[in-house]
Amino acid sequence: MPKIITTRYYEKKLNVFKPKHPELKEKYAKTIKLLQADPWHPSLRLHKLKGNLSDLYSISLNMKYRILLDFIIKDDQVFLIDIGDHDGMY
């Protein structure tokens, strides 16, 4: 089971995101729990990004919102980098 690590930037973005989207509170908690249990679960829609963000991966909160992350597979760690809407993050 990978260890979930949040960056300071991610925490700041999350503190802005959560109050704006209270309807996603349960979905967010479920997504993070699933990410920790099985990062490759199909419902997360995990995929590697391209272009300037090619070192990162993305998972879906829903069809509009994403969480950017970085895998350190060797150490079994997942770093949460950013959270926001699909268009604003890419």
Predicted regions, residues:
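Short functional linear motifs
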Residues: 22-25, 54
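Short alpha-helical linear motifs
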Residues: 30, 51-54, 69-73
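Hydrophobic alpha-helical segments with strong N-terminal bias
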Residues: 32-35, 66
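A short, surface-exposed loop/turn module that caps and links secondary-structure elements
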Residues: 34-59
